[in-house]
Swiss-Prot record:
Cleaved signal peptide residues: none
Name of the gene: truA
One GO BP: tRNA pseudouridine synthesis
This protein's name: tRNA pseudouridine synthase A
Protein species of origin: Pyrobaculum aerophilum (strain ATCC 51768 / DSM 7523 / JCM 9630 / CIP 104966 / NBRC 100827 / IM2)
Active site: D43 (nucleophile)
Sections of the chain in a coiled coil: none
EC number: 5.4.99.12
SUPFAM superfamilies xref list: Pseudouridine synthase
GO function term, MF aspect, one: tRNA pseudouridine(38-40) synthase activity
Length: 256
């Protein structure tokens, strides 16, 4: 029977989630054996609160966490049916944090409305070379919030393509600075131009949650340890530190 494990990690401690000897997944294989699936393949530098991995082994979370590398925790477990695909989530939530350097937040919100909905997002995707990479997807919501000297951009959708959120974050910040107009963004959606939009730095991005019709058994001790870790690393005022603090706050919400 397959099992899903909720995991949180500091993205700066690993070279991405998978695809590299120093990524997180090879460390997880040492604990679980075969990895049958994962919720998201986050890039190097991207942190996560609620990513998942699927394995064929049920293991006590206390034991798993005794073997986890520094900067990573398994804090939930759920049994799922045979054939379950963790890529087919109901919803994915991400947060991008950036320093506020005078961007017009109202313009960013106007641009965010434009980027929501169902579109061909080719201009906002880094294609990996596959011949049939799907570029049409749906973004349910983008919320732009100013908190002190930082901009928080929340994204919600069923699925995001490679580098899509970081490219949209760059575009929204560029719109707020007047580098791109809302009309420019509309044109990038109507007349897609792959490679036209750069990616914002990875360290500002956090995978907050992947939603399934699954009930997880939660290890609150692991949650608290992850929370304390993220807060302890967020003492310095930077986008990455703020992203880690937001990750800690998101973890704390699971305890309430």
């Amino acid at each position: 029977m397959p099992y899903l494990y909720r995991i949180a990690y500091d993205g700066t401690m690993f070279y991405g989630f998978t695809g590299h000897p120093n990524s997180l997944e090879p460390r997880l294989r040492l604990i679980f054996g075969e990895i049958l699936g994962r919720g998201s393949r986050t890039d190097p530098g991207v942190s996560a609160v609620g990513n998942v991995v699927m394995t064929g082994r049920k293991m006590a979370l206390g034991y798993v966490n005794s073997k986890m590398p520094k900067g990573a925790w398994a804090w939930g477990i759920a049994e799922v049916p045979e054939g379950f695909n963790p890529r087919r989530a109901k919803l994915r939530r991400y947060l991008y944090v950036a320093p506020h350097w005078g961007e017009d937040v109202d313009v960013m919100r106007e641009a965010a409305k434009l980027l929501t909905g169902t579109h061909d997002y080719s201009s906002f995707i880094q294609l990996r070379g596959e011949k049939h990479t799907p570029t049409v997807t749906t973004v349910y919501d983008i919320d732009v919030t100013l908190r002190g000297d930082l901009i928080f951009i929340y994204f919600a959708g069923r699925g995001f393509r490679n580098k899509m959120i970081r490219k949209m974050a760059w575009a929204l910040l560029a719109a707020g600075r007047g580098v791109l107009s809302v009309d420019d963004l509309a044109d990038l959606l109507k007349k897609p131009r792959p490679g036209a939009v750069p990616s914002a730095p990875a360290e500002g991005l956090v995978l907050l949650d992947i939603v399934y019709d699954v009930k997880f058994e939660v290890d609150f001790s692991a949650l608290r340890k992850a929370y304390v870790y993220f807060l302890s690393k967020s003492r310095h005022l930077s986008a990455h530190a703020a992203a880690l603090r937001a990750a800690g706050e998101a973890l704390a919400m699971w305890e309430s």
